Structure formats: C-alpha cells, structure tokens
Amino acid sequence: MLSQKPKKKHNFLNHGLSLNLVIKPYLALEGSVAFPAENGVQDTESTQEKRETGDEENSAKFPVGRRDFDTLSCMLGRVYQSCWQV
C-alpha cells in the first residue's frame, strides 16, 4: 500500500510566492483625501454657487418616471426585489 500524506490546505503563500508588495491600508490616505471634512465645506459652497448661477432656460429637463427610480435603486442595491423584476 502507498502511504498517504496528510492533505494540506491550499494556500498560495506556501508555494514559494514572495509578496514584496507594499499595500497601504485604506485609512492611510494622504493629502486632502485624508481629511475631507476640512475641505468639504468649501467644495459644497462652490458647488451650490454653480447650481444657482445656471440658466434655467438653457438647462435640459428630462422626464423621470417611477421605472427610472426603480432601476436606479436596484443598481444601488437598496430594494428587496431582483433587478430583473423592475
């Protein structure tokens, strides 16, 4: 009879692959991204100014129906039914 070796869990780290990758954690962001609360107030105010200064006559208006909202909420994953049922 052949002797059977105990089965090891398949793990790519055990196969000689060296991982010399330096991966920063999600919270180790640099610059203005690290503290959006400080810059967020200025961005919000400038966005609001741009919205108020737009011409109402030249702005495009599209009819939005219930089906559009259902499809959007389905894409965002905030409904309990499947996307194909929309």
From Swiss-Prot:
Protein species of origin: Homo sapiens
Region (Melanin-concentrating hormone-like): 68-86
Region ranges (NGE-like): 31-49
A GO BP annotation: chemical synaptic transmission
Tissue note: Expressed in testis and brain.
Domain of life: Eukaryota
Region (NEI-like): 52-64
Matching InterPro entries: Prepro-melanin_conc_hormone
GO terms under cellular component: extracellular region; synapse
Disordered: region residues: 38-62
Family indicated by similarity: Belongs to the melanin-concentrating hormone family.
Protein name: Putative pro-MCH-like protein 1
One Pfam family matching this protein: Pro-MCH
GO molecular function terms noted in the UniProt entry: melanin-concentrating hormone activity; type 1 melanin-concentrating hormone receptor binding
